[in-house]
Amino acid sequence: MTKQIIALVGRPNVGKSTLFNRLSIRKKAIVHNLPGVTRDRKYTDGKIGSCEFLLIDTPGLEENPNSMSVRLMEQTTKAILEADLICFMVDCRSGILPDDKLLSSFIRKYNKPAILVVNKCEKAFDFDKEYYQLGFDSMVAISAEHGTGLIDLYDEIIAKLPKEKSIETNIADPVKGDCVQIVISGRPNAGKSTFINALINDERLLTGPEAGITRESIEIDWQYKNNHIKLIDTAGLRKKSTITESLDKLSASDAINSIKFANTVILIIDALSPLKQQDLNIASYVANEGRSIVIVVNKWDLVKESEKEAFQEEFYYQINTHLPQIKGVSVLFISAINKQNIEQVLDACLTIYKNWNKKITTSKLNEWLNFTTEAHPLPLQKGGKRVRIKYMTQIKTRPPTFKLFSNNPEKITNSYTRYLVNNMREAFDMPGIPIRFAYVKTKNPYV
């Protein structure tokens, strides 16, 4: 059963994201007193009592001819066209501004059910003539931040939603269940949003030549080859030393949190600004968090044909040298804007996701362990006693984690652990997967 869709529309900083968080089942929008934080259509499941719906947060709109404003208007127009109900928000502190009047006319021409939501009303509020002149028959005064007036808003929402669509509970969500969460990460302006738009064949995310357009993590539910996918676009991650504004800090924190809860991370790298230390830092962070990763070099169409082979050789060398913990990681060269090789990226993600969830039987593990340690045994210790790894078992997946029992685990060097991990990746077909070993001392002192 299709859920009702409610769009929150208004000029910048009227409190749309605050109300979005109030109505959503879980907080998803960054809230900041700087205007224009939201730049993409942001979707979440919302709920009022027993009623469930899909909620859209939209960019703040203002009358401005620059290209960014035009692109923001396109995002909001798409949300209005999708919506069954529009909540048009204004700020009671500033009163009705010229942009509010222009936007109200813009909304009314679509002939959709709408509610005028006057936000930031911390005290008793009386609607005067200027609010009625906006042309809405339903008006509610609220404070989204403090929660006042929300019951009145809930009543209006339920009353104004079209009756021919049911909004009862137990609505089937096609993307619940075994859903692969794929986070798109990278430095600013690497083409992350362009990649997602190309993948889903929709201008879902705002793109452009400006660095840092995406400020929040945007989730998109999608299906690919009968797999439920949640694509998560994130703000570009800059070096810590260059993050000075509080909003940039919030955006970076939001992106980092998305990586922590990801299944797979696609690291997008700009071919015209190849492999910087920040790219390596992001990849290391992903591996240290135990997430699976696919590396994508975007804007490959802009690299000269005569330079591509040398580029790839140097790129692979740098990855293998600086990121040994994800040795064998999939690297794909694409052009998001031309939709070149983009499906290969998703295929690689699904493969690595499967390997990230891999469970290996104890018998196969110990057969491999015996062969590998005999081929390259640990060196003898003082007194002629050899350090031995007697037994191992897998204790978890996501990432694959193994417990190894040894007579003297503290003598097992990091280099020997790398030897075992690299050999395991090859033996069990787990290239690029972060693998974790936990050594335990055997209780029997004679082994």
Curated annotation (Swiss-Prot):
What GO molecular-function term can you cite, just one? Answer: GTP binding
Q: Which UniProt keywords apply?
A: GTP-binding, Nucleotide-binding, Repeat, Ribosome biogenesis
Query: Which parts of the sequence bind GTP 1?
Result: 10-17, 57-61, 119-122
* Pfam families in the record: KH_dom-like, MMR_HSR1
The UniProt entry, under InterPro entries, shows: G_ENGA, GTP-bd, GTPase_Der, KH_dom-like, KH_dom-like_a/b, P-loop_NTPase, Small_GTP-bd
Gene Ontology biological process: ribosome biogenesis
Q: Which Gene3D superfamilies match?
A: 3.30.300.20, P-loop containing nucleotide triphosphate hydrolases
What job does this protein perform?
A: GTPase that plays an essential role in the late steps of ribosome biogenesis.
Family named by the database record = Belongs to the TRAFAC class TrmE-Era-EngA-EngB-Septin-like GTPase superfamily. EngA (Der) GTPase family.
What is the protein's name according to its record? GTPase Der
Provide the species name: Rickettsia canadensis (strain McKiel)
Its encoding gene is what? der
